[in-house]
């Protein structure tokens, strides 16, 4: 077999390498080119395994993407990749509830960082884990491990979307306008809606 490979590709020599490709990585890359991304299948399997509330995940995905489009136009070459990661984060951010409701975001982040997730590189998993970790609770833990602006962009979108859908019901949200500023984001929400949603308004105040 090796002789045939050398002949077919006109190879002259072979050099030993201490590195190795992860099992299945070539099939994974080939699948992405043919629009059969293994990562999508993995995310769907995790949602089923950890009994994710799919309606809530869909609500948050929709709102998080709407926020992202205000901060990163769809014609930006980075948009597709960032949007894809945001969708995965929105679908998986509650998998830790299967472990415990308390600090579930930490459990979600741990599972994502350490589980076997076919199609995802360890770097991808680490990034996804940080975004999920940052969607809730204090941000100091995330600040200690990343200063990457694009990750904070996704954290902001996921965090705000989760906050707006804290009631976990289908309801019409107000228009939300966001812009990126030098050291964070500027948020504008309809005052009448905030007055009618005092609990959400209080949580938003805590975020400022």
Q: Model features per residue range: what roles?
A:
Residues 1-168, 174-187, 192-195:
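Helical "lid/coupling" subdomains associated with nucleotide-phosphate turnover
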Residues 196-208:
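Short, non-transmembrane amphipathic alpha-helical segments
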């Amino acid at each position: 077999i090796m002789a045939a490979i050398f002949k077919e590709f006109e190879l002259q020599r072979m050099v030993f390498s201490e590195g190795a490709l992860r099992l299945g990585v070539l099939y994974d890359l080939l699948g992405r080119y043919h629009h059969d991304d293994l990562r999508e299948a993995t995310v769907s399997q995790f949602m089923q395994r950890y009994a994710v509330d799919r309606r809530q995940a869909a609500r948050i995905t929709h709102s998080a993407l709407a926020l992202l489009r205000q901060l990163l136009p769809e014609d930006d070459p980075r948009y597709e990749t960032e949007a894809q990661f945001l969708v995965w984060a929105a679908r998986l951010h509650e998998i830790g509830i299967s472990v415990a409701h308390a600090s579930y975001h930490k459990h979600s982040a741990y599972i994502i960082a350490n589980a076997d997730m076919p199609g995802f590189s360890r770097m991808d998993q680490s990034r996804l884990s940080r975004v999920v970790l940052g969607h809730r609770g204090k941000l100091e833990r995330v600040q200690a491990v990343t200063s990457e602006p694009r990750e904070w962009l996704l954290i902001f979108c996921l965090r705000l979307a989760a906050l707006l859908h804290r009631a976990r019901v289908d309801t019409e949200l107000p228009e939300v306008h966001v812009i990126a500023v030098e050291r964070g984001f500027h948020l504008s929400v309809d005052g009448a809606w905030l007055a009618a949603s005092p609990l959400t308004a209080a949580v938003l105040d805590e975020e400022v």
